[in-house]
Regions:
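Non-catalytic, conserved peripheral segments adjacent to functional cores
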Residues: 1-100
């Protein structure tokens, strides 16, 4: 599992899970509680409690909304995705910075 920390937005991480290949195809572990032991900016553990799937038609723009208690694990299962993240934490040194 490869983790990359954002240089623009503190706390933003990109996770690249390993892909296991064999004669049957590919296997990717999308979530494992033991591997995702993150804390928020106050040092409190982050607990993954909900998993959702969104299926969009071509050229659809969706907005993701968050708050202090919510974090997002975003993955593209098929096709392409263009993700833009904006730091909306008003007390963050990266306030209103964005990354895509």
């Amino acid at each position: 599992m490869q983790f990359t920390e954002s240089s623009l937005i503190p706390g933003l991480k990109t996770i690249q899970p390993p892909v296991f290949h064999d004669y049957r195809g590919e296997y990717i572990e999308t979530f494992n509680e033991g591997r995702y032991s993150f804390t928020d900016r106050h040092g409190r553990p982050i607990r993954f409690v909900e998993d959702d799937v969104s299926i969009s038609r071509n050229h659809v723009l969706r907005g993701l909304h968050g708050d202090e208690k919510t974090w997002k694990l975003i993955q593209c299962l098929l096709g392409e995705i263009y993700v833009v993240v904006v730091d909306m934490r008003s007390d963050s040194p990266a306030y209103l910075r964005w990354e895509s």
